[in-house]
Every structure is written in structure tokens, then in C-alpha cells.
Amino acid sequence: MTTRQLQDLIEKMSTDEKLAQITQLNPVCFGFPYITPLTGPDPGLRIDRNLASSIGSVLNCDNASDAAAMQKAHLQEDPHSIPLLFMADIIHGFKTIFPIPLAMGCSFSPSNIEEASRIAALESSVSGIHVTFSPMGDLVRDPRWGRVMESFGEDPLLNSMLCAASVRAYQGADVRQPYHIASCIKHFAAYGAPEGGREYNTVDMSRGILHETYLPAYRSALQAGAEMVMAAFHVFDRVPASASPYLLSRILRDEWDFQGAVISDFNSVGELIAHGVARDGKEAAEKAISAGLDIEMMSTHYMENLNISLQEGTITEQMLDDAVLRILSLKNKLG
């Protein structure tokens, strides 16, 4: 489909359908309780079947038969026959297990990373996965942080080279071709530098250090063609990354001209309330989408609140349509 055809499709969608399209839930949340979630707590979300029929993407359904069953049921119910996207974490291999990224980084070998990512793409694509939340571009220099092993290490140049190698292998020359998947670089930005090495903690650094040391790996991944970006959990410069116009709009959109979709991490829109920057789910949703966050993962504040926000004028229809277009464009690109 052309961009004009995708825009025409968006014009036919109701507001509720658009809000469902920019929401990602795991299979349990909309009627597939036998598919065990692979990550995160059960948030207790159970949504109306009519809304479930328009959900845009699924988190961590990792086998072909379940994915096919979900897709078939979804396409029978979705009023516009818009397919689901299936997304999953691939940390160090899918079925074939490789050394952790930190160990792979010690090889100083982009070709090793390419081979591991190529095999993971092959195995995951035939298991029904369209997008992986990988590679992790977070540069790490504090061994106390509990996710050090998911990073390629402490050097900006090496991280940049290895992230780009991983993206190239996941996506191939044409991501639509068999045995390839789209790459989502994470966690934007500087998630690997929390104070005291404590997970989810505040990241406090100058913007100069951010740009010189911590951003190059993400940018390298995007220059290699990564289709998506995941926003991080933490606070940077006193604003949570999931609601940061500086990170998600000024850097990603304005400076780097990134045109793809940006997704939250697990329930990070809801966590804006715990951060103290939003009074409730409505304000959290407004701040996130206004900052440039297209997809809400594993919470439903967009679905529950943004219809009212549109009526009140605190967000615009264009913001919503832009987010939906980015998602539909990726689905179209993946075939």
C-alpha cells in the first residue's frame, strides 16, 4: 500500500480503533490464557473483546502455531483486516543460544554478532515473530547494574559497530524477505547509566556526555536501518524517558530524522504516575503521546483516556494519526 492508501485507511478507522492499534498487550490480556507471558508481571488487564479485535501488536508469543491461531482469530474480527504484529525479546539467541551480549562484545567481532543475529532472525521469523527488541544499545560502565550482561560493553565505538552489525543481520537487505525480522533498538536513552547501578534509577549526566558517549550506539543502529526504538524506564534530565520531548522528539525526530515507531517499555506509561510527573493515567497518556511515544506496551492508558483528551483538545487528532501511520507503515513494510 502507498502512504496515501494507508492514510485513507486511517480516515476510515474510529478513534477507539486507532487507540487499540497503538496498544500492545500479551496474549493473556485478550483471551489466550494458555500462552504463558515470558516477561513482566501480570498487570491484571482484561479488555473487552470488541476492543481486542483492533489491538495493534502482541508481546511475547513465541511459537508459530499460537501466532497463527491468534492472527486468524484477529483477522476474522478486525473491521479493517489489519494484521497483528508479534514482537519479542531476543537477548542472546532464540532457539540456538549464544554467549550473552557482553561476552560477544569481548570478541570485538562484528561478524560474530552478525552470524548470531542472522540465526536468531531465521529461528524467530519461522516462529511467527515480526519484531525483536534487540539489540540493546545501552553503554554500561557500572558493573553493579543488573542488566550489564545485555550490553555489548563500555566503549562507544565498539557498541556502535556491534549494534549496527546486529541490525543488519536481523533485517537483511530487505526486511520483507523470508527469515528476517525488524529490529527495535533499546532502551532510549542512556538506560545503562543509572545512579548507583540500581535498576530504574535516575540517570544524571550532561547532555555533552549523553551525545558523545551514550547516544552513538543508538544512532548507529538507526543508520543501519533499525525500524523501531524502545524508550527507557528511567528519568533523564528530570523527565522520564517515556515522556521526554527532548529524547523522543528533538533528538530522534528533529536531529536524527527517525521516521519509525517508538514503543514504551513494559507499563512505562503507567509508571509516569509513580515518577510523579502525571496525576493519573489520563495525564500520563497525554504526556507520553505528546512527547512522541507511539505504542503503549502492557498498559491501557491510551485506550482508556485519549478519546477524552481529544475531545478536550489536550492532544490533537494529528498526533494520534501520526502514531497510527508509523505502525501501519511498518506492517506494510513487513508485508
Task: Enumerate the language-model features and the residues they cover.
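Glycoside hydrolase catalytic-domain context in secreted enzymes
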Residues: M1-G335
